[in-house]
A protein has these predicted regions:
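Beta-hairpin "wing" of winged helix-turn-helix
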Residues: 58-69
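Conserved segment of winged-helix/HTH DNA-binding domains
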Residues: 73-90
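Short amphipathic alpha-helical interaction segments
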Residues: 43-57
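Residues within the helices of the helix-turn-helix
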Residues: 34-35, 53
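Short alpha-helical segments that sit at the start of domains
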Residues: 1-21
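A short acidic, leucine-rich amphipathic alpha-helix
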Residues: 36-40
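Short capping segments at the starts of secondary-structure elements
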Residues: 18, 29-33
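Pre-recognition alpha-helix immediately N-terminal to the DNA-recognition helix
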Residues: 21-25, 82
């Protein structure tokens, strides 16, 4: 499997979930906390945290403040930014 195959598998993974897609699109606008994401997208904060953990495992998001208990800041990785560009075209 080459890099483009892996990229499109990750893109399909994100598109398979409305919440994952919306989080990626929302993070394309800058740094956000799980609470900000939850309020904006109408998703419970604990569910947002689980989704962010999944997206982090796929190397789509990065936590800038991992040692902070509340108010962690998340941003998209380079791959996450590419995914958001594809989602913007959908």
């Amino acid at each position: 499997m080459n890099d483009s195959d892996e990229f499109f598998e990750v893109l399909a993974y994100v598109r398979a979930s409305r919440h994952r897609s919306n989080i990626i699109k929302f993070l394309a606008h800058g740094l956000k906390t799980p609470k900000e994401i939850g309020v904006e997208l109408d998703i419970r904060t604990n569910h947002v945290s689980n989704l962010l953990a999944d997206l982090k495992k796929k190397d789509l998001v990065f936590c800038l403040t991992p040692n902070v208990h509340k108010g962690r800041l998340y941003k998209l990785t380079d791959v996450g930014c590419k995914i958001s560009e594809y989602l913007g075209d959908v």
